[in-house]
Amino acid sequence: MGIIDEAKRGQITDEMRAISKLEGIPVEKVRNRISEGKIMLIRNAKYPSRKLVPIGKGLTTKVNVNIGTSSEVVDLDMELQKVKVANKWGDTLMDLSTGGDLDAIRRDIIKASDLPVGTVPVYQIFIESFKKKSGGAYFTEDELLNTVEKHLKDGVAFMTIHAGITKDLAIRALKSDRIIPIVSRGGDMIAGWMIHNNSENPYRKNWDYVLEMFKEYDAVISLGDALRPGATGDAHDEFQIGELLETARLVKNALQKGVQVMVEGPGHVPLNEIAWDVKLMKKLTGGVPYYVLGPLPIDVGAPYDHIASAIGAAISSASGVDLLCYLTPAEHLGLPTVKQVEEGAIAYRVAAHAGDVVKLGRKARKWDDEVSYYRGKLDWENMISKLIDPQRAYQVYTQFGTPKVKACTMCGGYCPMMWAMDQVRKIGSSSSL
């Protein structure tokens, strides 16, 4: 029995109690929202990760870190270093490898990760088909489904399943005047398969069986947005919305079967459209968790897309997004280094908390208030220890040596907090004030 079925039966399990304690909300709310599909636990029940990662309504915004080899760069040691970065800064991890021994790489990443690991199974079968049959779209439906099952057996906790795109939507998008017809790698693979085989989406055709597989492991289906906008000029066109409508139907069906499900979102979206993108998705899907790639509010930001997208991510988080998929400085340019993975993850930790201050209010802001209290007291040790990155903060604080006065090296002896404390002492010692 999966966690949704347990919640629907009114059961309160140890996992629900753990979520309640972690997030600081009543366990009855946790149970009720799980039963409605508004909270879920990212896990593979047969191979639990070392970190508990719930996402959804009323919970803190979580951050996903993408790693993985490419056809151009296969360096497993580097990817395992990225896993260490993800363990420190992230909540979930996706292996998007497309080069090397994909089975071995995936298993090594799962073994090294403290976090729930996700994959995009169509990558593997497309690449294997390309190598063995001289064409990526030559795989069979059974081969795709067997790949999904293999990933579940390996302990994968969530998978991007591009089931929302139909053959009609794919053909019309490719013939359209979109700036970039299809930007999703997995979505393009499914579109290519449908066109080559003159057949409907293999995930949709076998949807009941897909649900059965995920139900067995109580793992999470992450419904991919194959037609997400790859340019801000394509945002919220008929193809993105058309796929979302199809996805919403699949969501309802999955929840009816007791299968955990979330929806993936864009992508490239102008700043003024981000909040209502979230509201639209939540409305159409009944409030299931939303997993969003930023979004990027501009298209010209590379190699600073981690900064540009963090702006969009803060707005999307504040508007109700539950899981943020990070971007790195290498986005749109190449495979990221370990350092670039860290830069992206930290940017998204900042964005997630900025959103939570709006979304969760006082519960999230307590952290900021504590830091500000110590800052006002010039209590550097306690203030620095509470920051997002204490180690880096201390390096910056001491980069010109230890300050000669209690203040930092920016204001020195003219620090307003230092002067304010001095004035308070004078006021307290004066009988005339």
Curated annotation (Swiss-Prot):
Listed GO biological process terms: thiamine biosynthetic process; thiamine diphosphate biosynthetic process
Residue numbers binding [4Fe-4S] cluster: 408, 411, 415
Chain residues that bind Zn(2+): 268, 332
Residues that bind substrate: 66, 94, 123, 162, 184-186, 225-228, 264, 291
Required cofactor names: [4Fe-4S] cluster
MF-aspect GO terms: 4 iron, 4 sulfur cluster binding; carbon-carbon lyase activity; zinc ion binding
Cofactor: binding comment: Binds 1 [4Fe-4S] cluster per subunit. The cluster is coordinated with 3 cysteines and an exchangeable S-adenosyl-L-methionine.
Pathway: Cofactor biosynthesis; thiamine diphosphate biosynthesis
Keyword annotations from UniProtKB, A to Z: 4Fe-4S, Iron, Iron-sulfur, Lyase, Metal-binding, S-adenosyl-L-methionine, Thiamine biosynthesis, Zinc
Enzyme class: lyase
EC number(s) reported in the record: 4.1.99.17
Family: Belongs to the ThiC family.
Alphabetized PANTHER family for the sequence: PHOSPHOMETHYLPYRIMIDINE SYNTHASE, CHLOROPLASTIC, THIAMINE BIOSYNTHESIS PROTEIN THIC
HAMAP family assigned to the protein according to its UniProt record, in alphabetical order: ThiC
Function field: Catalyzes the synthesis of the hydroxymethylpyrimidine phosphate (HMP-P) moiety of thiamine from aminoimidazole ribotide (AIR) in a radical S-adenosyl-L-methionine (SAM)-dependent reaction.
Record's protein name: Phosphomethylpyrimidine synthase
Gene responsible for this protein: thiC
